[in-house]
Curated annotation (Swiss-Prot):
It comes from Cupriavidus taiwanensis (strain DSM 17343 / BCRC 17206 / CCUG 44338 / CIP 107171 / LMG 19424 / R1) (Ralstonia taiwanensis (strain LMG 19424)). It comes from the Bacteria. The keyword Magnesium does not apply. Transmembrane segments: none annotated. It catalyses: Release of an N-terminal amino acid, Xaa-|-Yaa-, in which Xaa is preferably Leu, but may be other amino acids including Pro although not Arg or Lys, and Yaa may be Pro. Amino acid amides and methyl esters are also readily hydrolyzed, but rates on arylamides are exceedingly low; Release of an N-terminal amino acid, preferentially leucine, but not glutamic or aspartic acids. It is an enzyme of class 3 (hydrolase). This is Probable cytosol aminopeptidase. Binds 2 manganese ions per subunit.
Length: 516
């Protein structure tokens, strides 16, 4: 889908003005109430009071979540006019704006419209600027239009069979191909940059969703490594992929312990984007890449285990984020690090009670092989010390306990530094990809005590997400660090099953803020 921005003079709406633009659909927002303003007022004048009459007669009240499609409206160049309800102006929040965008996309998806002049960006919430409105519009429109993995042969065959039998396949794309986002003339430059950034973020989210949604027999550790190579080649990043022998040479005993049960070779992926100059310390993103998690010898229940292909969504989001950063050309140095493997049971798999030595030299008693994410991450967190990072953020579908604590709304955020935590929280709010800060009190560390090693890899049922973060904290004392537990936000179950692309919006906004 192609997005662009266009600066319009709202005082010249009709005749040769923007309302005369030839397009398949003109999208206009209306607040609830009798008073028309902005684009709605201009449209009303150009159509000789049509909009006002619709409101007065109660045919369209502008209530949130509602819409009205008009066809062949006199005085308008568009084939259709879509009126979108914005609700009460006093209650027009970020979420209300997002709801309006989604309402418009749903309405357009039931038509054959291929192009739209989008006049909602000027009606962003008061505290938001045009850049926010444009980026949010693009990411939400692309998110709503996402369809799963059509390039893969197996899915193509299934789609062809469904089409032949008249069955819906869930991969039918809407007709919309071109969206022109209208902005005020004074916002032209900011809007143009925002369109580039919004497209990059949407591309990163789609990559993240694709990788997460792929079945684990396709998206193996090797597949992730090849994806990283492809990103590096397209965007001129530096790529280094370490195999088993190199991982062994680095003494990554914790990571290797997880890999033992699987026939799939582990990979350790490093991508470097150098946009900030040689002297700038990089921000390092570390993503958990368990491409399938059975739990190992501590086997998970069979029901719902298919969703454990999503246990690499941390890795997927890190790859999606660095791709977005490269597409945006941010003046920032960013490193993406992904330890990736499967967690499988076998005759040679790691057993509960085994003791291993991590890259840091600290020993770990593996009390539960299903607490494997922290084992691959701890060695990665030691490895990244060599970059002398400005900050390190690890991203992982780490604990079911985080879902119990926060549900599927907020990602769990852990950080020692208030400044880093606040920056991430603020970025999440702006990107509508929110997180909630969780505790890291030293008292929780007591739960990780072991009689046979420096620590156990679990701390019991109480505060399970917290103790997992406390485990990681032991390997991050040499730099500023934050941990995002995305177990509740990386994918959805049920009818809407699939990867969400989170926390790419949060991470990209955080990096844009640092680069500003």
């Amino acid at each position: 889908m192609e997005f662009s921005t266009k600066a319009l003079d709202w005082s010249k709406a009709g005749q040769n003005g923007f309302l005369a633009t030839k397009t398949d659909c003109l999208v206009v927002g209306l607040f609830e109430g009798q008073n028309l303003g902005g684009v709605a007022k201009a449209l009303d004048v150009a159509t000789k009071g049509l909009v006002g009459r619709l409101v007065k007669q109660g045919d369209f009240e502008g209530k949130r979540g509602t819409h009205l499609m008009l066809h062949e409206v006199a005085g308008v160049g568009a084939a259709r006019v879509l009126l979108v309800g914005l609700g009460k102006e006093a209650d027009f929040t970020d979420k209300a704006f997002a709801d309006a965008v989604r309402t418009a996309v749903r309405a357009l998806s039931s038509t054959r419209a291929t192009s739209a002049l989008w006049c909602l960006a000027q009606q962003a919430p008061q505290q938001r600027d045009v850049s926010w409105a444009v980026i949010t519009t693009i990411t939400l429109v692309r998110e709503a239009g996402y369809r799963l993995l059509e390039r893969h042969p197996g899915l193509k065959r299934a789609n062809a069979q469904n089409a032949a039998s008249g069955k819906p396949n869930g991969n039918d794309k809407s007709s919309l191909r071109k969206v022109v986002i209208a902005v005020d003339s004074g916002d032209a430059r900011a809007a143009t940059q925002a369109a580039v950034r919004g497209t990059a973020i949407a591309n990163g989210m789609e990559l993240t969703r694709d990788l997460g949604n792929l079945p684990s027999n396709i998206c193996t550790p090797t597949y992730l490594a090849n994806t990283a190579r492809s990103i590096a080649k397209r965007h001129k990043l530096k790529a280094e992929i370490l195999g088993r022998k190199q991982i062994e040479a680095l003494n990554m005993g914790a990571f290797l312990a997880v890999t033992k049960g699987s026939a799939e070779p582990p990979q350790f992926i490093v991508l470097r984007y150098d946009g900030g100059g040689a002297r700038q310390a990089p921000v390092v993103l570390v993503g958990k890449g368990i491409t399938f998690d059975t739990g190992g010898i501590s086997l998970k229940p069979g029901e719902g285990m298919d969703e454990m292909k999503y246990d690499m969504c941390g890795a997927a989001s890190v790859l999606g984020t660095i791709q977005a950063v490269a597409e945006m050309g941010l003046k920032l140095n960013v490193v993406a690090v992904v330890p990736t493997c499967e967690n499988m049971p076998s005759g040679v798999a790691t057993k509960p009670g085994d003791v291993v030595t991590s890259m840091s030299g600290q020993t770990i008693e593996i009390l539960n092989t299903d607490a494997e994410g922290r084992l691959i991450l701890c060695d990665a967190l030691t490895y990244v010390e060599r970059f002398k990072p400005a900050a390190v953020i690890d991203v992982a579908t780490l604990t079911g306990a985080c879902i119990i604590a926060l549900g599927h709304v907020n990602s769990g955020l852990y950080a020692r530094s208030d400044a880093l935590a606040d920056a991430l929280l603020q970025a999440g709010r702006r990107a509508m990809d929110t997180a909630w800060r969780m505790p890291l009190d030293d008292e929780y560390q007591d739960q990780l005590k072991s009689n046979f090693a420096d620590m156990g890899n679990i701390g019991g049922r109480p505060a399970g997400s917290v103790t997992a973060a406390c485990f990681l904290a032991r390997f991050t004392e040499k730099y500023d660090w934050a941990h995002l537990d995305i177990a509740g936000t990386a994918w959805k179950s049920g009818a809407a099953k699939g990867a969400t692309g989170r926390p790419v919006p949060l991470l990209t906004q955080f990096l844009m803020d640092r680069a500003a």
